[in-house]
Amino acid sequence: MKRIVVLGAGESGSGAAILAKEKGFDVFVSDCGTISDPYRALLDQNGVSWEDGKHSEELILNADEVVKSPGIPLTAPLIQKLQAQGTPIISEIEFASRYTNAKMICITGSNGKTTTTSLIFYILKQAGLNVGLAGNIGNSLALQVAHEDHDYYVIELSSFQLDNMYDFKADVAILLNITPDHLDRYDYKFQNYVDAKFRITRNQTKEDSFIYWAEDPVIDREMKRLQLGATLYPYGFTVPNPLPVSEEELALKGRHNVLNSMAATIAANVVGIKKEVIRESLKTFQGVEHRLQYVATVRGVRWINDSKATNVNSCWYALESMTTPTVLILGGKDKGNDYSEIDELVNEKCHTLVFMGLHNEKLREHFGKLVESQKSKVERPIQIIDTNNLHDAVQAAYHAAKEGDTVLLSPCCASFDLFKSYEDRGEQFMEAVRKL
C-alpha cells in the first residue's frame, strides 16, 4: 500500500488526508504546530493517524509521496531532506485534481485574487452550475472531491500553492497582476516570484484559456518572452472592453475592481454563461470581507477594514479609492516591502499614519524621511503615531481623526506578528471599532 504523508493539518492538509484515506492509501498527518479541534475530530472520524507539536522523521521520511501545506517553505530542513532522497512533494490541489474530471477555473495574482475568485463563483452559481469554491478560500478542494464532487471549481491559488504543482492543468487560468510580494520566500529575487505565478499556465493547450491583464508591465514583459500553449484573452483599459454593463453599474467600486470585473466577465464568457446572467451578477455581487469593508461611522468618521491588504500594492489600491482625508493604520510582519510605492498617495491622502506592529523600525525609518522632506514644503506635515498593538492603534486613530475623515486599516504587511491570520486581524479591528 502506497504511503502518503501530509505535512500541515489545516484546511488543505486535512482535506488531502481524508481524500488519500478514501482512495486506499496508508496516510499519516504531521503538524509541528497544534492541530485545531475541528481538524482533529475530522481526522479521527476518518481513521487518519496524526501527530502535532513535532515532525517525527522516522514516520515521514518513509513516505512514497508527501502533500505539503503551502505555508511550509521549501527551505525547511525536513523538506530539504525529503528532496535530497527524491521523495515527490506536491500540493493539496495537485493531489485532489487526480481524482476529479471537473473543469478548473484558477485565479492568481498579487492582488485581487479573493475578490475575483468570489465574483466568478457568484456568477457561476447565479447561472445554476454545480460549482465549488476552493484554494485559499472556501473548503479544501480535496475534501470537496472526496465528499461532494462538483462539475466546476473556482480556485484561488497563491504562489506557494503553484510551487508544488506539476501535472495539474487549469482549464481557465487567470493572472491578475504581479507586484513584489512574499520576496522573503523567494530568496528576495523578484523573478523567482514571477516564475511561480506563471506556473498557472503550466500544461495548458489550445483548448484551455489564459486570461491576463495586458497593461501589467511585468506580465507584458513575460508574455513577450514566453511561448504559451493556451488560447490568450488579454483584458485592460487599452483593449476592447468585455464588460456588459457600464463601470457606474458595477457593484464593486474602484479602478482595480473594474479590472477584476473584466477578468471575471471573460472567464464567465469562456465557460458559456449567458450575457444577462453576467450582467445581473456584476450589478448585485456583495464583495469580500476584509477587503475595503465598511465597518461603521463613529462621530462622523468612517472606519474601513482592509486587513486583506498584506502587501504594499494592495494598500496602494485602497488609498487610491479614498475620497476624504485619511488616517492610515499599517504595520505587521514585513515581507521585504518597498513602501516608496505608496509615498505619493500617502502625501496626497493621509494626515496621520498609525503604526501597529511588533517591529515598526522599517516603517519609522521610511516614513520618518517622508515627513522630514515635507516640513519645508507644507504647513502641517503628516503626523506619525507608533503603537505595538491593535487596541492602542485604534485609540490613536480615533483621537487623530476629525469629522468627515476616514480611518483605513490597510496594513501593507502579513498579520503573523500579532494575529492568527488577516481575518483574525480584521475581526479584532472591527470589534475594537464597534466598542468606540
Language-model features: locations:
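C-terminal helical cap/extension that packs against the catalytic core
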Residues: 39-41, 340-404
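Phosphate-binding loop of NTP-binding sites
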Residues: 21-22, 57-63, 70-214, 218-230, ...
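Residue-level detector of alpha-helix initiation sites
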Residues: 11, 73, 111-115, 258, ...
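Residue-level signal for inorganic ion chemistry
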Residues: 20, 66, 107, 136, ...
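Nucleotide phosphate-binding/pyrophosphate-handling subdomain across enzymes
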Residues: 3, 15-23, 250-351
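Short internal beta-strands
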Residues: 26-33, 210-214, 329-330, 349-358
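N-terminal leader/targeting and accessory segments in enzymes
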Residues: 1-91, 95, 253, 365
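Short, basic, low-complexity termini and linkers enriched in Ser/Thr/Gly/Pro
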Residues: 84, 227-231, 239-243, 368-383
